[in-house]
Amino acid sequence: MLLDFLDQLFSRHSGNSREQAKQRLKLILAHDRADLTPAALEAMRLEILGVVSRYVELDSEGMQFHLAAEGGTTALIANLPIRRVKPLAEARLNSCEGENPQQDPGAAPSEGGHLSSPSP
């Protein structure tokens, strides 16, 4: 998460340096306005992944989480690629079990619906 933020902050994309500076400033302002520590943002990310994983199988490769500021509002943007939607019965079972959101952040749901570490 922090590496994504730093990558966006210092990326070397082609384009106008004025626009790049503007985008960097927006990212910094978003983090300042949200007043979230990196640890709090990471905990929130893990909890969101845990809840969403109860209902759908996620593709951990394309996941993105970041803060964005626009018009005085700060938003948490989450891009979660979905591999498949779980059957309703499986989703209900996972919801009742109350998965632990403090799992591996790149974890993908296993057959039982619990998060497990991705295979190498």
Curated annotation (Swiss-Prot):
Coiled coil: none
Annotated segments matching region Disordered: 93-120
Keywords: Cell cycle, Cell division
UniProt cross-references to NCBIfam families, sorted A to Z: minE (TIGR01215)
Family, as annotated: Belongs to the MinE family.
Function (record text): Prevents the cell division inhibition by proteins MinC and MinD at internal division sites while permitting inhibition at polar sites. This ensures cell division at the proper site by restricting the formation of a division septum at the midpoint of the long axis of the cell.
GO biological process: cell division; regulation of division septum assembly
Xref: Gene3D superfamilies: Cell division topological specificity factor MinE
Originating species: Synechococcus sp. (strain JA-3-3Ab)
Short name of any one Pfam family annotated for the protein: MinE
This protein's name: Cell division topological specificity factor
